[in-house]
């Protein structure tokens, strides 16, 4: 049996009774240490709570299905920060397990995406699928990121941007925004990226939500983990909610024309 267990965003406080029971009765417990960033000491705290060792897994170990031979005859659990099936990696693991006749149980929990949409005050029907922003260089400059943002903007949709990790930290905000602006320049798109909402350390004690124009956001520093929304035209309710739920970094934040 393979249990893929989402532990949400609030550390041990997000673990349900069913999840606790599944972890406590597992023969082996592993933790995904790549796809999401958990609260400091999370794995150590869960280990103490269930009174058993938790072994960290790299991305390659998860993608290679290294835990499936054990799951064929033992009760194996994989801990995932957030929701367990938001990353393709975990659905691939689920697929391979089922293909091999291994039973799979999924334990849902809150993800950064659904939490961020609500906390920012955005309308869920106006939010597009997320894009991932990697660290770019002259040798690796994926303009598909800005193409997706433009298509979403043309449809009046906000684009969630998930920021790549370097040494378990998100790329710094200034670098991420500079990359997006350079993509916009190379594609000769005008004014696609104007207003942004940045959400830092959602559900952590030092949670921060910032809202404003990109030129003002470039001057800000936020702690990892964070993600952002490239905002399309805001409706009256969204702008009203953002004005109260977030900290404005711009003196005046004009609506998208």
Curated annotation (Swiss-Prot):
InterPro entries, per database record: 4pyrrol_Mease (IPR000878), 4pyrrol_Methylase_sf (IPR035996), 4pyrrole_Mease_sub1 (IPR014777), 4pyrrole_Mease_sub2 (IPR014776), Dphthn_synthase (IPR004551)
EC class (word): transferase
GO molecular function, one term: diphthine synthase activity
Positions contributing to S-adenosyl-L-methionine binding: 9, 83, 86, 111-112, 163
Catalytic activity reported: 2-[(3S)-amino-3-carboxypropyl]-L-histidyl-[translation elongation factor 2] + 3 S-adenosyl-L-methionine = diphthine-[translation elongation factor 2] + 3 S-adenosyl-L-homocysteine + 3 H(+)
Biological pathway: Protein modification; peptidyl-diphthamide biosynthesis
GO BP term (any one): protein histidyl modification to diphthamide
Family: Belongs to the diphthine synthase family.
Name listed for the protein in its UniProt record: Diphthine synthase
